[in-house]
Design a protein with these regions (language model features):
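Cytosolic regulatory regions of ion transport systems
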Residues: 1-180
Length: 180
């Protein structure tokens, strides 16, 4: 019996069929039927709800822009739902997860996880299901960003570059305000 759990973990990691089978019984893998339909069209799909995803969601909330969260961490999805926001649990590089996030009617896909291969898969799926979707991706290195840009996968952001731009903007603005 001790081998069952590791075998299940291995099967889910290596088989889309096993992941789909696992999702059938997971109530967090689909949006509740009570989800307001106006939230399911023209929305932003935010993949990953770590620090970056939460910050993006906060800005979207301030601007009253609808979004759906897709995250592989069940506890995160539960917390998002408790906060009254729509969220689905699962690996968003699996088409089922993006379908559950209503990617077919979404205006934008925002991928905050720094996984180049998974990001590419998510964009491919999203564009097949919704050819006019806009995509925004996070890259963890300039090399990864260059690969994503070369393949025209969307607007690409690298954390260190964005931080440097923000700091430089602040410094130059403060220094320009000083006399002399």
């Amino acid at each position: 019996f001790a081998a069952i759990e590791p075998a299940q973990v291995w099967a889910r990691a290596h088989s889309a069929w096993a992941r789909r089978l696992d999702l059938r019984d997971d109530p967090l893998a689909a949006l509740p039927m009570t989800t307001d339909r106006k939230l399911l069209s023209g929305q932003v799909v935010v993949v990953g709800f770590g620090r970056i995803g939460r910050h993006i969601a906060s800005v979207l909330d301030e601007r009253h822009i609808h979004y759906i969260v897709a995250d592989s961490n069940r506890e995160v999805v539960e917390a998002v739902r408790r906060a009254g926001k729509p969220a689905v649990s699962g690996d968003a590089s699996d088409p089922i997860v993006l379908v559950q996030a209503h990617i077919t009617k979404a205006a934008m896909l925002v991928v905050t996880v720094p996984d180049t291969i998974a990001s590419r898969q998510m964009v491919d799926i999203a564009r097949k299901l919704n050819p006019h979707i806009e995509t925004v991706l996070r890259a963890d290195t300039e090399d990864a960003a260059e690969l994503l840009r070369r393949d025209k996968l969307g607007e690409i952001f690298v954390g260190e570059q964005e931080l440097a731009r923000g700091m430089a903007r602040h410094v130059s603005g403060r220094m320009a305000a000083q006399p002399g």
